[in-house]
């Protein structure tokens, strides 16, 4: 069965579906993996300076654990963003609608169809929701990861060998935030 609309309608539907899919744009992926790499590398300083793990001798361990942690933290970013985006969009809908309507001048308002106004409002709402969900996801997961690393390193695993402490605290912290991100609340 052929699509009912023309190519314009098909592309609009594709854009709308893209806004609600779990797939990330290349820009979002780069942002997530860049941030995840930075936050995953921060504990290296902690273990190098405080736990006295040599940088050169532990370089392979640091590299492997940082890459594993980077993947898990980026996974958590993506999941939290997806869950939050719809909630933020619902909460910001009225404010965004008022803002877009106010920005349209009276002349534009008469020339524009109701459907086109609704599309602009929907596009702006998705843009705002995407931005807010992305920034909150990064903030929330970074904070949780670093707190978990510090608690695990200095309190739970303090009597372990520094190498074992590093492996367990990084893997447990990144694994826990990845696990918590799969929840739907």
Curated annotation (Swiss-Prot):
It is a multi-pass membrane protein. InterPro entries: SSR3 (IPR009779). It comes from the Eukaryota. The modification Phosphoserine is found at residues 11, 105. This is Translocon-associated protein subunit gamma. Keywords: Acetylation, Endoplasmic reticulum, Membrane, Phosphoprotein, Transmembrane, Transmembrane helix. Disulfide bonds: none annotated.
């Amino acid at each position: 069965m052929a699509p009912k609309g023309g190519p314009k309608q098909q592309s609009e539907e594709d854009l709308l579906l893209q806004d609600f899919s779990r797939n990330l744009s290349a820009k979002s992926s780069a942002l997530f993996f860049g941030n995840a790499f930075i936050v995953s590398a921060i504990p290296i300083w902690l273990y190098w300076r405080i736990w006295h793990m040599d940088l050169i001798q532990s370089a392979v361990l640091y590299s492997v654990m940082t890459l594993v942690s980077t993947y898990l933290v980026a996974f958590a970013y993506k999941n939290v963003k997806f869950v939050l985006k719809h909630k933020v969009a619902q909460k910001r809908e009225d404010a965004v609608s008022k803002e877009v309507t106010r920005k349209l001048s009276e002349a534009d308002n008469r020339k524009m169809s109701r459907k086109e106004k609704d599309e602009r409002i929907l596009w702006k709402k998705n843009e705002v929701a995407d931005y807010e969900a992305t920034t909150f996801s990064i903030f929330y997961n970074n904070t949780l990861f670093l707190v978990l690393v510090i608690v695990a390193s200095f309190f739970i695993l303090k009597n372990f060998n520094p190498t074992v402490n590093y492996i367990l605290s990084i893997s447990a912290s990144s694994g826990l935030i990845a696990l918590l991100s799969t929840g739907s609340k």
